[in-house]
Curated annotation (Swiss-Prot):
GO terms for biological process: DNA recombination; DNA repair. ATP binds at residues 27-34. The keyword RNA-binding does not apply. It comes from Thermococcus kodakarensis (strain ATCC BAA-918 / JCM 12380 / KOD1) (Pyrococcus kodakaraensis (strain KOD1)). Belongs to the eukaryotic RecA-like protein family. RadB subfamily. The keyword Chaperone does not apply. It comes from the Archaea. Keywords: ATP-binding, DNA damage, DNA recombination, DNA-binding, Nucleotide-binding. Involved in DNA repair and in homologous recombination. May regulate the cleavage reactions of the branch-structured DNA. Has a very weak ATPase activity that is not stimulated by DNA. Binds DNA but does not promote DNA strands exchange. This is DNA repair and recombination protein RadB. Pfam families: Rad51.
Amino acid sequence: MLSTGTKSLDSLLGGGFAPGVLTQVYGPYASGKTTLALQTGLLSGKKVAYVDTEGGFSPERLVQMAETRGLNPEEALSRFILFTPSDFKEQRRVIGSLKKTVDSNFALVVVDSITAHYRAEENRSGLIAELSRQLQVLLWIARKHNIPVIVINQVHFDSRTEMTKPVAEQTLGYRCKDILRLDKLPKPGLRVAVLERHRFRPEGLMAYFRITERGIEDVE
């Protein structure tokens, strides 16, 4: 298990992010998805393959998190191998290339987010199949190297159910055995994580956390 650095989230996930498994982390803007992925990679002590499709990866934020935790910021930055595909086609190429990039020196793969370029495409016919293929490649990497893969996802409003749901819910749900939803709460900095699916933990469990300079911390 790869620790998130917080007791509450580790407990919620059954010890942390599971190796050999795709974990979907989804939620609205600024709910803590990227911070959670950065912190998990930072504390792993090993290399992280980070596919940033939204421009959300912030070296400054990573440095801040490292410094406030007494870690070497330059060493931390050097461990994050960043990929920035500009469209869905390039995303396909980048994810395919990870099969050669990721080796035993890597502790984690993050795709942030898997659906941003998919949503930007005008003609989505056939793209669901391609999205499924990309997820299959990520699952192959997770299993081959026995490491976690965090797949960050966006949300959309479903007018039929009048609820916010993850984008491409069925496609991601088929491949992702663990699903974690993050939400903002009225109190500034406070967030809640809801376990929507897990291989052995009960669904619906919740954990509260704060977003601070250090990253994500337990609520005291």
